[in-house]
From Swiss-Prot:
GO cellular component, one term: cytoplasm
Function as written in the Swiss-Prot or TrEMBL entry: Binds to the sigma-S subunit of RNA polymerase, activating expression of sigma-S-regulated genes. Stimulates RNA polymerase holoenzyme formation and may bind to several other sigma factors, such as sigma-70 and sigma-32.
Family matches, as Gene3D superfamilies: Sigma factor-binding protein Crl monomer (3.30.310.230)
Keyword Cytoplasm: yes
Gene designation per UniProt: crl
Domain of life: Bacteria
UniProt xrefs under InterPro entries: Tscrpt_reg_Crl, Tscrpt_reg_Crl_sf
Name of the protein described by the UniProt record: Sigma factor-binding protein Crl
Gene Ontology biological process: positive regulation of DNA-templated transcription
Keyword terms, alphabetized: Activator, Coiled coil, Cytoplasm, Transcription, Transcription regulation
Length: 124
């Protein structure tokens, strides 16, 4: 499938997968991509499948002229769902933000390296 930006979706998916464990292929749609990051475990005592995490998720869409994006912050709960929630604790906030910034830099670099190059534009 060719995207509005002129890039094949399969090639973009391969490139996005190479960015790390962020892309959630099952939650992507035709021109929309979903990324997330489980940055900080809330409590390591429960079994791994029952743990909750503080982190971020990103909705990215190919609009043709650019990729529009919107980040959200919150809690990844025991049911495997994101809930937009205020992150607690200065150290936790820093870790989540640092993880997001590191990813964003790599994403921007990847999009600029495409031929034709693409840019990121925050959704208003």
């Amino acid at each position: 499938m060719m995207l509005p930006s002129g890039h094949p979706k399969s090639r973009l998916m391969k490139n996005f997968t190479a960015l790390g464990p962020y892309i959630r292929e099952a939650q992507c749609e035709d021109t929309a991509f979903f990324f997330d990051c489980l940055a900080v475990c809330v409590n390591i005592k429960p079994a791994p499948e029952e743990r909750e995490f503080w982190g971020w998720w990103l909705n990215l869409e190919d609009t043709g002229k650019a990729f529009s994006y919107e980040y959200h912050y919150g809690l990844f709960d025991k049911q495997g769902n994101w809930r937009e929630e205020k992150i607690k604790g200065k150290a936790v906030i820093e870790q989540v933000e640092n993880a997001k910034q590191a990813f964003h830099v790599r994403l921007e670099k990847l999009l600029r390296s495409l031929e034709p190059a693409c840019t990121l534009v925050a959704r208003p």
